[in-house]
Amino acid sequence: MKGYYNFADIEKKWQDKWEKDGLYKTQEETDKDNYYVLEMFPYPSGNLHMGHVRVYSIGDVIARFKRMNGYNVLHPMGWDAFGLPAENAAIKHGNIHPQDWTWDNIKNMKKQMKSLGLSYDWDREVTTAKEDYYKWTQWFFVKMFKKGLAYKKKAAVNWCPGCETVLANEQVVNNACERCGTEVEEKELEQWFFKITNYAERLLEDHKLLQNWPEKVKIMQRNWIGRSEGMRIKFPVKGSSEEIEVFTTRPDTIFGATYMVLAPEHPLVEKLISGTEKEKEVRQFIDRVKKQKEMERTSPESEKEGLFTGAYAINPMTGEEIPIMIANYVLMGYGTGAIMAVPAHDQRDFDFARKYDLPIRVVIQPEEREEELKDTDLNEAYEGSGHLINSDKYNGLTVKEAFDVMAEDMEKEGIGKREVNYRLRDWLISRQRYWGTPIPIVYCEKCGTVPVPEEELPVVLPRDVEFSPTGESPLAKVDEFVNTTCPVCGGKARRETDTMDTFVDSSWYFLRYTDPKNDKLPFSKENAKKWFPVDQYIGGIEHAILHLLYARFFTKVIYDMDMIDSVEPFTNWLAQGMVLKDGAKMSKSKGNVVDPEDILDRFGADTARLFILFAAPPEKDLEWSDRGVEGAERFLNRVWRLVADNIKEIKNTDQASLDVNSFNKNEKDLYRNLHVTIKRVTEDIGERLNFNTAISAIMELTNATYQYLNGVEKVNYTLIKDIIEKMLLILAPFAPHMTEELWSELGNDESIHIQKWPGYEEKALKKDEVTIVVQVNGKVRDKLQVSADIDEDKLKEQVLELPRIQKYTEGKEIVKTIIIPKKLVNIVVK
């Protein structure tokens, strides 16, 4: 055996053997309990980065640990292969076809993953850009279309000029495309949507089922869904049969509503201005506002602009005529596209009222204020709580009381009704790009919008396409794709040429892994029942809203189709931190990228894995350190030498079992250290996911073993054999190659990774002796080594016999003796 860990030879040897033996292949029929661990699958960019190494190493430790603990583990991997990044990269890299570019990248990244020693069942690999996968993405679309959950409408959409496509609201960050950073524009286009708003309440309500999700993630989702309880109230338009409906969370302030505001796009505007002297001026204003971006219109810093329409509404509670304005800060896509403006108690309304000299009426009196609050007292809106004033019979009621009483009265009088509203908007899934799942819809002049029959799926993405972005869907230029026959009447028809948002592909992939070869269904209910929901999901916090919300939505839709038994996809979710270098996220522009391939070439996979798991708790950001990597390498070589230096004696040990009762003190201490370590590592991996402290415990055990070997005259090699074998078993999930090699060198034929995880003995955890701190009047005066099970009288006796204690107690009265078992004795004297 060599005196050091030669990773270059050893790691490849075992990777090949594991693959040949099918060591990590998931068993379908077994009497073991099933466990499903999954890391978010990657977009095939071409190369792994350190963030990938971290998340996959975390998942791999859990998978290996669960296998050794007797579970039948599903640990698959696949590729989120469609979407803009692949298409943009293909264009950038010399007009290579996106499919070729993607397939090459998958091949390279798969090789890199294998070189990390990750225990994936590659027989279950899925690729979202392959027909055998996107056939079923289309199948789900058709099912959702038939249920009214997929629909097309004209909408103001976020348009990215850089990517030449539409973005969902969630993909716009600070008015820029999250992918390329280009400033986003608004366009009106016919687009496909999924009706995620139908599931808003369930998405909120079912957060209670996610006990093992980070609370901050649930808060982010709650804020995004934005549930608000309020009232939908009707304001009649003076001199007309028309009514303006508003949604408000503050019906208690209706007596302070002194004007109405409509979004410039509101359909009623046309009726109000048509043929009036205001028509020209209002139309010019509308044209100007339409050029403003939604983000710009709603920003608190943006100037509030408006115009009087010339029409009036009637406040249904006061009978008062109030002017109807249009303004840039009210959007048609939110609420009803109209608001009742209460300037005394809403800052935007206040700013607007001051600017256009509109009336301000205070209707909420702060509790702590003695004098009645008047509009002339206000420099800004009062948005706090209090009781009602200037509100007729409701005066004196608190805000909360008034909400309920006024809501009841308005419902009785038919003025309004209670309603729950959501900030969440339907999910826009249309993309005007090539590299995505074709939307399985045809348009027939006679039959209208028709879904492609399920038996005709998949609608195959053609290869011969000019996919450079022009703003129009590239598929629209492919006549043989576009021109088809109507599945209903057989007449001429045209295919939909938009493709789906890549988030659709990743919203159900975790279910396909349960039955990846099924060509009759996306998966069978029987197979899904065995594995679903995912027991442990791992991925970045940046996916808290987009991917995780969409995956939860899809799961509920599929549950309603009676295909699965769970309404939530992921029982436990771990959001791993980023890998930083020099305090910043790694990026080429910052010049602080650490290439995993370089690290694997220099140090090997086990060292890379060990460092990245040891350097920080998994949920925290990790600072890359070359010295830390070298430290991980040194530790692995210490373990290697521990085996190499003692292997001859260990193999010659003929005693089959340990005689614990014959141990001397040094042997007892080392044996106890072993079992304390097993307990700690078991709990750190299995309960807390604290891999860094688990590795630290193994390091401490290694040090203790060396200290024993170097400090005794006669070594108990039966004990050393037991310690080394168990140490290798608990180190195996972290350093799979080296432990496999050492396990084999010790004469074991079966892989270490299918061995039983070692248990710890409760009896061995107990100390035979404990150190007692001895105090006199609360000050430490001595320490005493005693038997762990000594009784209190005997302990007192031994304490009082200590010369240093007698020095402080002699000639004094002992008032009392305080004993904290196995820790402390405090003698109180006077």
Curated annotation (Swiss-Prot):
Gene: leuS
Motif 'KMSKS' region mapped to chain: 585-589
UniProt name for this protein: Leucine--tRNA ligase
Transmembrane domains' residue ranges: none
UniProt keyword annotation of Transcription present: no
Coiled coil: none
Catalytic activity: tRNA(Leu) + L-leucine + ATP = L-leucyl-tRNA(Leu) + AMP + diphosphate
Species annotation: Halothermothrix orenii (strain H 168 / OCM 544 / DSM 9562)
A Pfam family: Anticodon_1
GO function terms (MF aspect): aminoacyl-tRNA deacylase activity; ATP binding; leucine-tRNA ligase activity
Chain residues that bind ATP: 588
Motif annotated as 'HIGH' region, chain positions: 42-52
